[in-house]
Amino acid sequence: GEDPAEISCHGSQYIVSEILRLLTASGARMAGPGEFTIRAYLAGKLDLSQAEAVADIIASSSRAAHALAANQMRGGYSDALEGLCEKLLELTALLELELDFSEEEVEFADRAQLREAMQRIGAHIDALRNSFTLGNAIKEGVAVAITGAPNVGKSTLLNRLLNEERVLVSDIAGTTRDVIEERINIDGVVFRFLDTAGIRATDDRLEQMGIQRTMSSIERAQIVIYMTDAARLAAGAPVAPEFPLRADQKLLVLVNKTDTAPDCPLPEGTIGISARNGDGIESLRRILRSFVDTEALYHGDAIVSNNRHYEALTAAGDALRR
């Protein structure tokens, strides 16, 4: 909405600097961070959600996160909100007509029609709200908690996924006391791996604190990797985790150190790996990536990734149902 002026000059840094010096001496100034986005918003060229998406594009660290932000900047989320607003206005108009002519023998919509309209709007809001699980995970990274008993190879697994010795590995049980977080890009999606303290009964106060942090990491993870090893299986250790999981959490049970017991039968539903020599790691990467369905990103579907948008939709849904 503003008239621009473009200066084409020689590529010399001195010439560019001199032009900028002359312009600023004549009253011009350098643009501040995000100033062109602000001007576009104030001029009505972008709405607030599109302006927020500009920052998300700049901060995106994966192909999926970039596609998500680009879709929002193109107006995908704005279009979904516009459709929602139209439905709400239609419902409001019907309610106002009923109130204005309540004493007349005129019925513009019966209660069943109004209830059905409210249910459709509620379903629209819920669909947007539910997309936040995927949107936020793509934007912030999919949280994956690596859990299990001490010395089953959790830190070795993280090092193998990173292809570097990032985490200290030791034969001494309880070496990992704090949660170590690392980000890994798997086929265009960022995963946040949380290497946690081994879970066991202990009197060590410091180790107990580490286990408490492990449980907190499990609670906020989208995917939980529960690790055991071939020796523990042979000794009758439980295959399934002994801590509760949410219904929406994905669980992977890994049997590590299969190279030390190649004849050990794997229980149904488990995945055999060797974090030390890399056996099964590529298969694990593919399984993790399959948990994140990004097809909707490339079809233009509206996906919520902003906490403010999610809270506003939650408030709208609550108000509709009151």
Task: Annotate each language-model stretch with its function.
Residues G44, N151, D195:
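Conserved G/P- and acidic residue-centered "switch" motifs that form tight phosphate/ATP-binding loops
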Residues F191, I223, L252:
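Short, Asp-centered acidic motifs that coordinate Mg2+ and/or phosphate
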Residues R63-I186, T202-D204, R220, A230-R322:
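C-terminal-of-GTPase-core extension/linker across diverse P-loop GTPases
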